């Protein structure tokens, strides 16, 4: 009788130990014998806040890599500004562009850039656009010369952007009194708008197209 009882007792001990062994992965489990759905007291708001992007953060997804310059009201989309910059002319000649269907956009640099790239010999005539377009790969047109309004949005967060650039070893965005960045909006035959990243302001008269200014590319994400 004792010999028959011993194997049964051992099997019971092994079963209890296996069921009560703590999990080595994941958080501690809360008893929920009815397997009912647990209500989230925060309604998921904490997780949503953590997932939102912020201006000044480094961003990389696929071929998109840069610093977040602006975030829209969703917290998930906005504008990236390039990690590096160029120094070049807006145009090598005084030619006034006539935009088909209206004027240059104050807020949509991608549209402005696409129009400039549609011009004959654009690669010889528009060095600032060429520099920005050089960041595109696989035939894409994601990077562009930003519009004045897009640069102005980035200027609002220039301190946060520069802090990240500096921590990564890149040149910061210049904010000196006489430092400006080319936008993609033309101003007459001889001018184009250039933006002060210290204030986001731009001269009403534009800058000489043949003059040299700084250039940063932007793209949407």
Where are these regions (language model features)?
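Bacterial Sec-dependent N-terminal signal peptides
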Residues: 16-56, 221
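Extracellular adhesion/carbohydrate-recognition regions
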Residues: 40, 44-137, 179, 191-195, ...
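Surface-exposed patches in mature extracellular/periplasmic domains of secreted proteins
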Residues: 140-146
């Amino acid at each position: 009788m004792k010999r028959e009882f011993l194997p049964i007792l051992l099997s019971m001990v092994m079963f209890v130990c296996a069921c009560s062994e703590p999990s080595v992965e994941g958080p501690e489990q809360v008893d929920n014998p009815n397997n009912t759905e647990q209500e989230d007291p925060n309604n998921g708001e904490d997780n949503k806040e953590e997932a939102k992007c912020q201006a000044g953060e480094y961003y990389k997804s696929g071929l998109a890599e840069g610093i977040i310059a602006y975030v829209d009201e969703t917290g998930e989309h906005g504008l990236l500004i390039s990690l590096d910059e160029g120094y070049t002319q807006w145009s090598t000649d005084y030619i006034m562009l006539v935009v088909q269907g209206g004027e240059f956009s104050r807020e949509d640099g991608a549209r402005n850039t696409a129009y400039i790239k549609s011009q004959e010999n654009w690669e010889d005539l528009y060095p600032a656009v060429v520099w920005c377009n050089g960041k595109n790969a696989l035939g894409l047109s994601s990077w562009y010369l930003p519009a004045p309004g897009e640069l102005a949005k980035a200027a609002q967060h220039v301190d946060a952007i520069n802090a990240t650039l500096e921590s990564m070893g890149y040149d910061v965005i210049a904010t000196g009194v006489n430092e400006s960045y080319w936008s993609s909006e033309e101003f007459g035959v001889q001018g184009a708008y250039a933006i002060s990243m210290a204030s986001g302001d731009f001269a009403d008269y534009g800058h000489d197209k043949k003059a040299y200014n700084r250039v940063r590319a932007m793209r949407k994400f």
